[in-house]
Amino acid sequence: MAKGKDVRVRVILECTSCVRNGVNKESLGISRYITQKNRHNTPSRLELRKFCPYCYKHTIHGEIKK
């Protein structure tokens, strides 16, 4: 029997550099990654360094609300 909500949830990580600078003319969009996290082990917002194809470098990608 199920105990309630799932422990693993799907989260979306968005490039903080693209969001902070805004989308300018040479940039085509904002980099987003979809991943999973365990709610019991990581109750706070997730932040990972990932490659942003729009900034052409590794930047911090933070969790956003759906």
UniProtKB/Swiss-Prot annotation:
Matching PROSITE patterns, A to Z?
RIBOSOMAL_L33
One GO cellular component this record assigns the protein to is: ribosome
- What coarse category fits the chief subcellular location reported for this protein? plastid
**Subcellular location(s) per record:** Plastid, Chloroplast
Gene Ontology biological process terms in this record: translation
Q: Which InterPro entries match?
A: Ribosomal_bL33, Ribosomal_bL33_CS, Ribosomal_bL33_sf, Ribosomal_zn-bd
Give the protein's recorded name: Large ribosomal subunit protein bL33c
Q: What family does the entry list?
A: Belongs to the bacterial ribosomal protein bL33 family.
Q: Which GO terms describe its molecular function?
A: structural constituent of ribosome
Alphabetical keyword list: Chloroplast, Plastid, Ribonucleoprotein, Ribosomal protein
Which SUPFAM superfamilies has this protein been placed in? Answer: Zn-binding ribosomal proteins (SSF57829)
